[in-house]
Regions:
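Cytosol/matrix-facing juxtamembrane amphipathic
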Residues: 2-53, 105-170
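Small-residue-rich hydrophobic membrane-insertion segments
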Residues: 53-128
Length: 170
């Protein structure tokens, strides 16, 4: 039975996250099931600028090409200012979960808005903390939204791409 699942990866660099996204797309995986979360800049003193035109977001700065490239492939691009994180950029289905959490003023046991949204998709508090730390350290979190079959396919593809750093979440 194909039950809903979420698989997650943490990438050290934006290049690694971009390569993984491209590899999944070339392998026939539906990239609309991918969410990427990370900072849009390298320091709080030098933020990246963003503006929207239609459904596209344009960006500048050291990671601007990365986000611009992903926003051409993934859907629901967005940028948020989040206390404790600064500017956080994301794309994919998770964006709507975060917007819902922000609109509903969801507070979950002292977690940030990002943490509350992550917990809403079934991620444990310990994993939420791990992802928040990764994002604050300029790493990138990839979430794959799908069913068991999707997650198994992605895991096989990305295991070939790099060491196994994935973890299934229920």
């Amino acid at each position: 039975m194909n039950t809903p699942k979420l698989i997650s990866y943490i990438f050290e660099t934006h290049q690694e996250a971009e390569e993984a996204t491209k590899l999944l797309g070339k392998s026939g995986f539906d990239v609309k099931k991918i969410s990427i979360i990370g900072k849009g800049y390298h320091s709080e003193e030098h933020p990246v600028g963003f503006y929207t035109t239609s459904d596209k977001i344009k960006s500048w700065g050291s990671t601007g090409a990365f986000w611009g490239g992903l926003w051409g492939v993934l859907f629901l691009p967005a940028v948020f200012f989040m206390p404790g994180f600064g500017l956080v950029a994301m794309a994919g289905p998770f964006t709507s979960v975060l917007v819902s959490a922000l609109e509903g003023a969801v507070v979950v046991g002292g977690l940030s808005a990002l943490g509350a949204a992550l917990s809403q998709v079934g991620i444990s508090k310990n994993e939420v903390i791990k992802y928040e730390v990764a994002i604050k350290a300029d790493q990138f979190v990839m979430l794959i939204h799908g069913v068991t079959e999707d997650c198994e396919k992605v895991d096989l593809i990305l295991k070939k791409f790099r060491d196994n750093k994935s973890q299934y979440l229920v």
